[in-house]
Amino acid sequence: MLRWLRGFVLPTAACQGAEPPTRYETLFQALDRNGDGVVDIRELQEGLKSLGIPLGQDAEEKIFTTGDVNKDGKLDFEEFMKYLKDHEKKMKLAFKSLDKNNDGKIEASEIVQSLQTLGLTISEQQAELILQSIDADGTMTVDWNEWRDYFLFNPVADIEEIIRFWKHSTGIDIGDSLTIPDEFTEEERKSGQWWRQLLAGGIAGAVSRTSTAPLDRLKVMMQVHGSKSMNIFGGFRQMIKEGGVRSLWRGNGTNVIKIAPETAVKFWVYEQYKKLLTEEGQKIGTFERFISGSMAGATAQTFIYPMEVMKTRLAVGKTGQYSGIYDCAKKILKYEGFGAFYKGYVPNLLGIIPYAGIDLAVYELLKSHWLDNFAKDSVNPGVLVLLGCGALSSTCGQLASYPLALVRTRMQAQAMLEGAPQLNMVGLFRRIISKEGLPGLYRGITPNFMKVLPAVGISYVVYENMKQTLGVTQK
């Protein structure tokens, strides 16, 4: 179909100069099915589908947002031609940015190199699979004509947008703070897109955490009290009986407030650690990204850890025990001293390595599997695949680090339990295993897993809508 498109609508001579209007007119007439001189979105959808032209996600809506100058919901020929010409200029710039050796062709090695600039590492074999989805003549290289034909109606703006699909970031927030920070391109930094994306992610995290707060508090209660008899329904009944429905959100305020300082610190120190681990001009690899991200997570956790302790104390506390965050901090300082704000800090720090490492490794494994087996017609995996990979990799990371998270939570709260010995990390591990067995180290993991799917869905929807509101993406 791409060969037909090149021969019938976009001849090879087009790469040498401006396209004759009659060529655009031929395509316009093919799309204008009722012959009324304009193309509406339904005609565009049906026409492009019947022509077999590759489309990006929500491509038709984006084309109309950009091309429909008078906002009448239809494209006349002048608007149609102007959109294609403007879009082709952007695609020419994208092609040149990929064509590193300026030979007029894109090769697999150049795709690998360009992906690395976005912090995404793939093999040469995987790059060849991507190349095959664009290559129309089987030469295993992509020239300008093939490139233009493939992205003719795919309304991406530049090469970074084209290959950004597999960045390990989709606005997912499942309530954990140990993930490796996002990578931002130079253009995103200069344009200010980076802080808008961080803000969108922060708002999405706040909404997601608030929506799943009852499950999070239940998890904390099961971790701290460690009772085999406390199941999910019994736990909810007990919390509602003790403090009413509002008590299900106890501790959520602190959990939301800490998003902003933690994100800011993690992002800033991540950039500093990357500079320390890589030479100037060198692109960061997966290993350096893992080390930098883990160190950034540890630094951010050190900075906001007192809020983690207060979140646990508020969640476990009884009605009337604390009037709010300030009252909780004041009582901890008065009765236990400043050191109490860092109880459980060591297991929390140790949990960062297995969580971040396994999260990143599983995501890379899933990405490689998809590229090897399914990247035949498009490099874009789609929203469901991205969300699924992100959720699954985070879940695997949680499984590995959960025992450390449980011990951390108990150390944070053990001063509140009457008659409970004040044990260190090793002592708590021994006590849990001797009294509850190995399953005791995973107490509360069921509600933790139950919140993953709603958290992923809510945070993604809010994140995408906030990006539109903040001007990161077009509506």
Swiss-Prot record:
Transmembrane stretches, start-end: 198-215, 251-270, 294-307, 344-363, 387-404, 444-463
Domain notes: The regulatory N-terminal domain/NTD formed of two pairs of fused calcium-binding EF-hands, binds calcium in the mitochondrial intermembrane space and regulates the antiporter activity of the transmembrane domain/TMD. In absence of calcium, the apo form of the N-terminal domain is intrinsically disordered and binds to the transmembrane domain, inhibiting the transporter activity. Binding of calcium leads to a major conformational change and abolishes the interaction with the transmembrane domain and the inhibition of the transporter activity.
Residues in the Mitochondrial matrix compartment per record: 216-250, 308-343, 405-443
Regulation: Activated by an increase in cytosolic calcium levels that induce a conformational change of the N-terminal regulatory domain, uncapping the channel and allowing transport. Inhibited by bathophenanthroline, mersalyl, p-hydroxymercuribenzoate, bromcresol purple and tannic acid.
Residues found modified as N6-acetyllysine: 318, 334, 435
InterPro entries documented for this protein: EF-hand-dom_pair, EF_Hand_1_Ca_BS, EF_hand_dom, GDC-like, Mit_carrier, Mitochondrial_sb/sol_carrier, Mt_carrier_dom_sf
PANTHER family, per the entry: SOLUTE CARRIER FAMILY 25 (PTHR24089)
Binding positions for Ca(2+) 1 per the UniProt entry: 32, 34, 36, 38, 43
Binding positions (Ca(2+) 2): 68, 70, 72, 74, 79
All residue ranges annotated as the EF-hand domain in the record: 19-54, 55-88, 86-121, 122-157
Residues that coordinate or bind Ca(2+) 3: 99, 101, 103, 105, 110
Organism per entry: Oryctolagus cuniculus (Rabbit)
Segments forming a coiled coil: none
Topology Mitochondrial intermembrane: residue spans: 1-197, 271-293, 364-386, 464-475
Tissue: Mainly expressed in colon. Also expressed in the small intestine proximal to the ileum. Weakly expressed in kidney but not in the liver.
Name of this protein: Mitochondrial adenyl nucleotide antiporter SLC25A24
The organism's place on the tree of life at top rank: Eukaryota
Region (Linker region), start-end ranges: 159-168
Gene Ontology molecular functions: adenine nucleotide transmembrane transporter activity; ADP:phosphate antiporter activity; ATP:phosphate antiporter activity; calcium ion binding
Record family assignment: Belongs to the mitochondrial carrier (TC 2.A.29) family.
Pfam families: EF-hand_7 (PF13499), Mito_carr (PF00153)
Subcellular location: Mitochondrion inner membrane; Peroxisome membrane
Membrane topology summary: Multi-pass membrane protein
Subunit structure, as described in the record: Monomer.
UniProt-annotated binding residues for Ca(2+) 4: 135, 137, 139, 141, 146
